Amino acid sequence: MPKLWDAVAGFAVTFGTLFKKPITEEYPEKPGPVAPRYHGRHQLNRYPDGLEKCIGCELCAWACPADAIYVEGDDNTADERYSPGERYGRVYQINYLRCIGCGLCIEACPTRALTMTNDYEMADDNRADLIWGKDKLLAPLQDGMLAPPHPMAPGATDDDYYLGRIGPATEDVR
């Protein structure tokens, strides 16, 4: 008889919770709110005219304790200018299989080229797709931006870019 009573008590719990509001998240259909200071996916930023902020200094790669960042710098030329300084990051990769999300790379970046977004959906079923290159990391072009390579704003120096004195690309640059 005690075993029957245990089964009835178990069903009482089951039936009691059957009509309550579910407490589980419906994640894929309705993503939950993200805290404003959440650090998720990395992003390589651009200046307002579209030039890249990354100067290829590799400080982010040196600061990474998990060795998840690979950077190859290259020199800008008069014909091909990707950033306002002498150098730019020709190859930039982040291996999200190794990244621990610590943010030390963000702190090490002297030009604020690398930041972290609120995007947290980076799952994939293929390991090779979790090594993100520059094409996935670069911020999308906004209105007034030109895709590099293009010359710097007329009369501007690299200091003008670093100090925020440059606005969107003008007709002179286009």
From Swiss-Prot:
Q: Name one GO biological process term.
A: aerobic respiration
For this protein, the record's InterPro entries field holds:
4Fe4S_Fe-S-bd (IPR017896), 4Fe4S_Fe_S_CS (IPR017900), NADH_quinone_OxRdtase_chainI (IPR010226)
What is this enzyme's EC?
A: 7.1.1.-
Gene3D superfamilies linked to this entry: 3.30.70.3270
Residue positions binding [4Fe-4S] cluster 1: 54, 57, 60, 109
Cofactor names from the entry are:
[4Fe-4S] cluster
Membrane listed as a keyword: yes
Q: Which reaction does it catalyse?
A: a quinone + NADH + 5 H(+)(in) = a quinol + NAD(+) + 4 H(+)(out)
A Pfam cross-reference name = Fer4_7
Q: Name the domain of life.
A: Bacteria
The membrane topology noted for this protein in its Swiss-Prot or TrEMBL record is:
Peripheral membrane protein
Which residues does the record give as [4Fe-4S] cluster 2 binding sites? Answer: 64, 99, 102, 105
Top enzyme category: translocase
Location(s) in or outside the cell: Cell membrane
Co-factor binding comment? Binds 2 [4Fe-4S] clusters per subunit.
**Subunit field text:** NDH-1 is composed of 14 different subunits. Subunits NuoA, H, J, K, L, M, N constitute the membrane sector of the complex.
Q: Which NCBIfam families match?
A: NuoI, PRK05888.1-3
Q: Which family is this protein grouped under?
A: Belongs to the complex I 23 kDa subunit family.
Q: What does this protein do?
A: NDH-1 shuttles electrons from NADH, via FMN and iron-sulfur (Fe-S) centers, to quinones in the respiratory chain. The immediate electron acceptor for the enzyme in this species is believed to be menaquinone. Couples the redox reaction to proton translocation (for every two electrons transferred, four hydrogen ions are translocated across the cytoplasmic membrane), and thus conserves the redox energy in a proton gradient.
Q: What is this protein called?
A: NADH-quinone oxidoreductase subunit I
